[in-house]
Amino acid sequence: MLRWLTAGESHGPALVGIIEGVPAGVELTSSQIADALARRRLGYGRGARMKFEQDVVTVLGGVRHGITQGGPVAIQVGNTEWPKWEQIMAADPVAPEILADQARNAPLTRPRPGHADFTGMQKYGFDEARPVLERASARETATRVALGTVASQFLKQLGIELVSHTVSIASVSVPEGRPLPVPANVIALDADPLRCFDRETSDAMVAEVDAAHKEGETLGGVVEVLAYGLPPGLGSYVHWDRRLDSRLAAALMGIQAIKGVEVGDGFLTASRRGSAAHDEIVKDSDGRIIRTSNRAGGIEGGMSIGDVLRVRAAMKPIATVPRALKTIDVSTGEAAKAHHQRSDVCAVPAAGVVAEAMVALVLAEAVAEKFGGDSVAETARNIKGYLDNIPASLDSIGQ
């Protein structure tokens, strides 16, 4: 069983993540995790924090000489800004007279619409939003990307690779029918300002971000994660919570600012006739069973089908709007403008990297659940044995 947990606050000393159930033999280094975190900071339209934020990675346990040992893997992502926040975010009590001189310690009593601020204050009984936003912040996703790197490395050694890309920013979208990126395209994707695989569309996206910046606005968009090399049969149809698409949807909806998820052609299929919505099963010229298309996105009946997995997540515009939205100052009860701090105009490219990490974690869990193995070599043998024993009459090949 693979499970994971994160802890820490946005301006605390560090974020910490633990992932358990990773087999021995996964090749993993601090630099690989750092590279993944650097990808999370990419993207045109990011705020000032990305310019000086450096993720200091420390692997605390579970790895020796670049190889996982079979125990829980613990990763710390240090906060280089901690000295500025040491007294304000200290775990132990700090004298009131010391805090009184700290401008950063001013109570945040004007909750931001679209954030967890107001409801979090209601739920936990806080009189200001600082305790809420510190944990609710998307900064926490740095830990998920770190843990997702562990999962990705595990999957990669089994021949399963992931790639994410941006398919829309606001109303600017990649035209239907354009080629999908493959793992070999990751470097080129990361070099694109918005991690878009279509150059012409990327240029239009940049213009959209520039226009929003001038108007004091923020933008959302849609990202897509693709997984190549999956065997058929991950997930199950027997219970709702074991369905692979259900688990992927939950994981992606758990990312800050994600408001919608679709697998394959998703919502588009709702407007089609049944004969144009599904993937017919035929034999190719070599007699192998194939599907004529991949509208299902690589999942049928809650199970992977051995084709490319394709899942999308829709991100709303960032709620910290420079123009500042209307709110109520809870300390006075009067109308006010919401608290504003540095923020991004568009963080959709980063959302793609986070989504990729979450998909990796779900798939790694599904692989471990289906095939087991205390070592990567054992897992690989189990997968081979499973595939070798699929009856010839049911043998298929991905699109």
Curated annotation (Swiss-Prot):
EC category name: lyase
Disulfide pattern: none
Binding site for FMN: R135, A136, S137, Q256, A257, G301, K316, P317, I318, A319, T320, R342
Lineage, uppermost ranks: Bacteria, Bacillati, Actinomycetota, Actinomycetes, Micrococcales
Amino-acid biosynthesis listed as a keyword: yes
GO molecular function: chorismate synthase activity; FMN binding
Protein name: Chorismate synthase
Coiled-coil intervals, chain numbering: none
PROSITE patterns reported for this sequence: CHORISMATE_SYNTHASE_1 (PS00787), CHORISMATE_SYNTHASE_2 (PS00788), CHORISMATE_SYNTHASE_3 (PS00789)
Recorded GO CC terms: cytosol
Subunit note: Homotetramer.
Transmembrane residue ranges: none
